[in-house]
Amino acid sequence: MSQVPVASPASWSSVASAAAAAVSAATSASSSLAASVDEPAATTATAATASYADERNPLIALFDGLLRVVLASLNLIRILATFSTITVPSLVYAILHYSLTLQLNFPSLALLFLTSLISAFIWLRYRHLNKYERLREVPITRDEGFNLNPDVASPGGDNDRGSFHNYLDDFLQAIRIFGFLEKPVFHELARHLQTRRLVAGDSLSLDTDFSFYIVIDGHVQVYAPLPSATASAVGQDSVEDEDDSGYQLLNEVESGGTLSSLFTILSLFTEDVKLSFDDHDDPHLAPPHPAYPAMDRLNNSSAANHLGRGNNATAPTSPYSSAFNPPSQTAAQLQLNAAALRNVPAAISTEGAVERLGGSAAVRSTSKSSHARTASSGTASATVQDGDTSTIMDPLEQNDDGVTSSLYHAPDLQMPPAQAAAPFSHFAPSYHPSPAGTPISSLPGSTHSPYFRGRATSIHALHEAAGGPNTPGSILSAMSSSAHGHYHPQADYLPRQGAGTVARATVDTTLAVIPAEAFKRLTKKFPNAAAHIVQVILARLSRVTFHTAHKYLGLTKEVMRTEKSINDLACFPLPSEFYEKGGMDKLRHRFLPQPNSKRETTVDDDYFRDFQEWTSISQRSSTPVPGSKDDTKDAATSSPPKVRIASDLPSLTTSSKQSNQKPTSSRISAARTPWGHPDPPLKTPTARNMVGPGDLLSMASLSQDGWYTTGFDMHSAQPTPRAKPRSVSKLEPFHGPLPHPVDDSTDGTSPLSGASPIPIRKGSSTMYHQGEAIGTDRPFANIGLPHFDIKNEVMDCIAKSIGLAQAAHSPLAPSYQASPHINAQDSLLQRSVFKSAFGSLSMLDAAMAEEESSITGTNSSMAGHGHSGFHPSDFENEVEIKFFPAGSTLVKAGESRAGLFYVIDGFLDVLLPAEANELEEEDRLKPNMNHKSAKTDASSGSSRQNRPGSHRKDSSSASLRAGLLDERNLREADVSLPQRRGTEADRISSNGDGNSGSVHRPAMREGSSSSTSYGTPAGLRKKPTESAKVGNALDGTGGAGSSSRRKPSHVSSGSGATTMPRHPDATNSNMAFTAKQPVLHPSLHQQQPLRGKPSQQSSQRSKDGKRSIFTVGRGGIAGYLSSLLGTASYVDITAKTDVYVGFLPAHALERIMERRPIVLLTLCKRLLSLLPPLILHIDSSLDWQQVNAGQVIYREDDPSDSFFIVINGRLRAITEKTNGIEVHNEYGQGDSVGELDVITNSRRRTTLHAIRDSELAKMPSTLFNAISVRHPAITIQISRIIARRVRTELVRSKQEGAALGAPIPGLPDLGRNNLNLKTVAIVPVTRQVPVIDFAAKLQTAFDDTIGGRAIFLDQSSVMGVLGRHAFSRMGKLKLAGWLADLEQKYRLVVYVVDTPVSSAWSQTSIRQADCVLMVGFGDEPAMGEYERLLMSVKTTARKELVLLHPERSVPPGSTREWLKNRPWVHAHHHVEMPGLTGSHAGAAISTGGDPKAVKALRNLKQKLETSLQRYRKTMTPLSASGRPHHASDFARLARRLCGMSIGLVLGGGGARGCAHLGVIRALEERGIPIDMVGGTSIGSLVGGLYAREAEMVSTFGRAKRFAGRMASLWRFASDLTYPVVSYTTGHEFNRGVFKAIQETHIEDMWIPFFCNTTNITWSRMEVHTSGYAWRYIRGSMTLAGLIPPLVDEGNMLVDGGYVDNLPVTVMLAMGARSVFAVDVGSIDDTSPRAYGDTLSGWWVLLNRWNPWSDASKIPSIPDIQGRLTYVSSVKTLEEAKKVKGCFYMRMPVEEFGTLAFGRFDMIYEKGYKAAVELLDGWDAEGKLPSGTEREDFEDDWEDGDEYEEYEVYTDDESGVGGGVRKIRKKRRRTRRKAGISARRNSI
């Protein structure tokens, strides 16, 4: 075991000594900095000793180390104590005792101070004063390429066919032409669907049957025969492929197209409809047998064809009458004749066509016997008397070959053709042939019974006696069905080109066929559906064919010839006894002025006061009243019942003996009158001095129902069914005594009984006094007509003329449910049944009730089954008897809803407007031409004017006016009252009495408890025209009557009248025979026209270029086509002589047509038979296309095979580029597209797509070529259209080429394409937006500013009209048709989206809109739910943003937040809406979020405004609080939507621009609103200041402060720099602009603003509409050399005046209609210079001091450079002066320098005075736009009329602001009242 050794004491001592040595060594080492190198041995020894000691004892080493550490610490403490107590105090002491001496002189101190000041200035300059440099936001760009690209909106939306396409799709597409079809109806057609295969080259005669052909697969060409005259020419020198075929290519039909003309379908539906109805259709009166059978006439030799022409004694046969040459033609031959007529080329006269039909001696013989003609060898004209024809052809009219046709030549104008119905039997024709020149009446068998009304021998009675012409059928079928073998082959009479249209398949083609039997079965099984199809076809005819022929092809004359033929066919004058017994004289006496007007009226007053006295005087010179004992006995013994049903009364109640008695004056030779009227010489009434106004108020039946007295409740809105009348119809002839049906249901007094006077109606006034009781109820009793009611007689004649009186097939079993049932809800529409393709689809609502479905309604008059006679008990007689002096204009071309004018006596001229006028008007009105059809019947039922009383001394110049307006008419008329200016007839014959005053008289009788008190308009009082002063040439009177015009309340124009406000208690009351008159202010009658008289101007225009198409005489009807088709009038209708007419308003005619489709069927029958072949060919080739929103119609570089006419909807033409798309133009209603490409045979230049669902008329180029061959005049018409289109594009390209070359997308079309907007949708951003209140204020603005020609629709209004199923799948087609109808009636249709996002109305509104207005709060830029809906719909319509603000201020940059997230917004508008609570700003104001101090200031402001308001009333014409209506933001928006904005463009000129402030002040004082502002240079600054808040005070202050800064020489000097780029740095200039504009963005400005600059980097002009305003205003003011160019995104911008100093074209491109352009530029010295070929500068310098030298005129280098820079600007300035709508204002401030800002006040005052003078001058001329003028001034009136608006006003109580302003103010007030009424009845 090992043991541990223990150290001895000696060893411990050694260890300790070693440790001590180690510590001492360590201490010495720490004290010394380094060991000595000389002692290595000692160190080694010490270390060895230490290690030895450590090795010896570790404890000793430890203690030794500790000891050394303690010692080292003590040493350190000693050192620190020494440093702190000795070293530091010594150092401090040394520093404190140190001294330094610095010596500086004053220059050194000044330099030091300046250095410090400059350093501080630089620090502030670049740190704080250049804050504007950091405002560099990039302008907002709009991604229009994405937004407007149709491929994005509707991929595959064009006609590309998918792989799953089949023939059923084509079939469904083709039958859309029939409108909406219910499922059983569709199945009925589909059940008969067949297919037919055509091999390439096969031909198909489209006239062989009436089947409906649809091309399913393949390609078919349609040909029409060439005219014989042109066929040879084409054969000799042909440009077509079909050189010698004799046919012309009309159309090329591809898959999905139709081959058949819709007229073939119409012919099936009208087989049993007669062309006209006469008394001889009744079985009681069998017509005489014809002299020749029809077949025998067709079998005669062709040599007799020229018999008519060879006969010098008779004029040629009327073509239309010859075409239907009964009396006993067979149906087959009638079909042949009609079909051949339809296929006769237009180049051949219609007479020649008849010759080709079958020219036999019998034809001519019968023709001669059927048409009495008078001849005169000494004259070049002949009177054409086709029995009862009511037309006189123009003697100078030529046929299509250019050769004057003998058809249009007649002898001297001796009498109207309708005088066959006059009481002169020697003018009456007969059935029997007579020798030439022999009076027909002298022949045996001629009928003279007055009951026959002279119509017994009319040509239409001839062929109607045989049942009327049947449907135009197939030529082949007619040949096969000819009876008795008397028919010669048609080839003997018709060349090959007359066979009709032929279809030829170019490739193997498959056709889908709906056979004719299917439509026949449809007619019998579903008559209501068939009626609907007829309506749709008529709609297509009117809206496509007639529209194209009239508006585009210039074939108005051809269309109106059809109306002339209809007048020839259906002429029904009044009974002859009315004329021969003095009825006409009594009627004329009715319009004489009242001689005893001072007498107070009583309840016994009647129209025929002192009638016996007049009768005694009249009978002295008139024929004694014919009568007999039977007459007396009949009148004395007959006791009519207490209630007389009108249908039970014959038209003329005379005995049979009386009927057979010839008038004693019938043998007297006709007396010549100046206008050819053969009036009997003994029937001239007493002479009169004037013709006064008035109305034939109540000639007989003054009952509450208008026609008869029953228990009908006038409070009912719709007529109730009457009791079933007797089988003896009113139109049925009567032999024997007058029947008196017994009616015990009432104890009232019949108006015909004469037992008691008519009760007085409250609220009405009369113009006549009642006479004795004997004449009260029988106005014609004293002249032998005791039961004659002229209103009923006129209505009977109108009913027969329009086909309403179709006789029943069986007189023993008349049907009384002859038309589809129309419920009350459908009748509320009060609209035409044919205006739209889907109009009056009553079966849609009825489909919800089985008993009203078109499937179950089997009794329909349209099918020809159960035709009942005309029963007036079914309708309310609304005929108005009116008088028009010679020269009056009843209807002007372009007017809608004119109504029917039945001529009682006199002549009406149907005039074709002058071609030059049309072209000029089209050029002038092209942007706004599609609203002309927006007219209503507001004035057609207007109140009639009373006969002038004794209160006016100038009654000699009383107007000859008469009109009616009852409350029911008001209720219907108010639907569209604001948008209609009324027909010419209404302006002449209604509401006004020339210069005469008016007096209220007691009512005639008591009506319903709430009779209307509607006052008639107080119109302009004009001097009588020359024609009116002549008086009635018929009776020799010299009554002076004014033919002044009148416009309804919303139109203030030439002779317009301002309608008085409706009485609040006015309700339903039939005022058919009540006259009304307003109380007019005396000052009205003292107003003198500013320009010429409209009637004289109209007469002058008529002399200048209007051509007469035909004349309408007695028994004729004017306005037939336009009224029944619901289109605007194609012609002017004027009074050729003093004329008395029966006027049937449009709304009354609409109700008749809704209940009796037979009227439309009769029209269809007549159109089938009488339309010229040219029109039929056009109709067969025109394609009616319905395209969906976004659908591409054609693309760029496609072949040009057709062009399009927009019927409804909107199209956009674009071209695609690398950086997006370029919008070229937008086309609205009435515009044509693509004809330039077709005519030039070039490829499409643009891509055309539909913005929304649209209707188009497509005209193929082949049709155009064919028409050009047949009608060369069309080529000229199209050439003019092309030339105008090219000229317009060239002018626009010149104007916009330099001005609109801006890189900002969307600026060129920012407002150019809003001029013809038709539909606008108001869509809220979120549901919290008060869109209803917004729409109400906007509608008020429309009414107050532009006349309210807009209708606002919301869901409730639409459902109220169309029912709760309006938005269902079934009702969509009906809704589309109704909306399209509204577009034609109104200038603007506004859809208000007031429903949830998911509703159908929201989507419908967006899809139907041309422009979408997104309405949101200005301080809430978040995306709303409706915006997401808008994006999902993918509409390509323009989208504009409306930001609502509670006050007129916009926080800077807030608008940018809206726009940067919505690149699809095209424009934005700031609108002030006081009381707005939905936004954050409005909530902050209303909830008290402001501090107490702000609240106190607001309260003080309100108190001050309230206290100052009483003083302001005497200073301003505005009585309402807030801004003027015309200056409000809503009015600005309304003008924007209608394209009537007023712009202000301010030019550049340095300090001379201070005159701009004076111009703005003058405009504000005159009340002219400023809707947009633009400027250049100093004009951009002044314009920007005004646009910021639209307030003059702040603008003036800020502009004056800027001028003060610029006038400071110190500031200018402080900004000088070394002139490398410019003389100044531009900082002071920038600072001055920024201080004036602040941080406002251009998009934040309240009024739309722009400024232009010149980009010298790219050498172009730029227009700025977004970004910081100060930057671009400064850039626009950058004068090169004085200020450095502004750098914007790398481009250098200088003064915009270098390119365009007055950017008028930019303002027009933004949508302004009128522009005030203010020029303050300097005028350069243009005097000649002469200084030789060389020039020494030294010589110039020396001679500048020589006063006799011309050296001062030598320009310097800066002058030469300045003139060079403004070369382009001078050219654009001259062009701007010539721009239409530009009011150029040159300010006389040339003497002031460019930098003369110190003369601010002088320049300002000079500009103000100059502006006032200019405005006064324009105001005196009537050219000054005010923002409140009616839009249809320019659209519908001539230059002489538009300025007379200033004379239309009512009394003004304020008495301030006289002259024009006073009148305007009152005009606005009156218009507002009318607008309120219209808004109340907007639907």
Swiss-Prot record:
Description of activity control: Inhibited by organophosphorus esters.
Ranges of Basic residues composition bias in the record: 1861-1874
Binding site residues for a nucleoside 3',5'-cyclic phosphate 2: 1166-1285
Motif (GXGXXG): 1548-1553
Record: residues binding a nucleoside 3',5'-cyclic phosphate 1: 863-1158
Pfam families: cNMP_binding, NTE_Ploop, Patatin
Keyword set, alphabetical order: Endoplasmic reticulum, Hydrolase, Lipid degradation, Lipid metabolism, Membrane, Repeat, Transmembrane, Transmembrane helix
Record's protein name: Lysophospholipase NTE1
Low complexity composition bias: residue spans: 372-383
Domain PNPLA stretches: 1544-1708
Xref: CDD domains: CAP_ED
Record membrane topology: Multi-pass membrane protein
Functional summary from the UniProt entry: Intracellular phospholipase B that catalyzes the double deacylation of phosphatidylcholine (PC) to glycerophosphocholine (GroPCho). Plays an important role in membrane lipid homeostasis. Responsible for the rapid PC turnover in response to inositol, elevated temperatures, or when choline is present in the growth medium.
Gene that encodes it: NTE1
Reaction(s) the record says it catalyses: a 1-acyl-sn-glycero-3-phosphocholine + H2O = sn-glycerol 3-phosphocholine + a fatty acid + H(+)
Enzyme Commission number(s): 3.1.1.5
Chain residue ranges for the region called Disordered: 284-327, 355-410, 618-693, 716-764, 921-1069, 1084-1108, 1852-1883
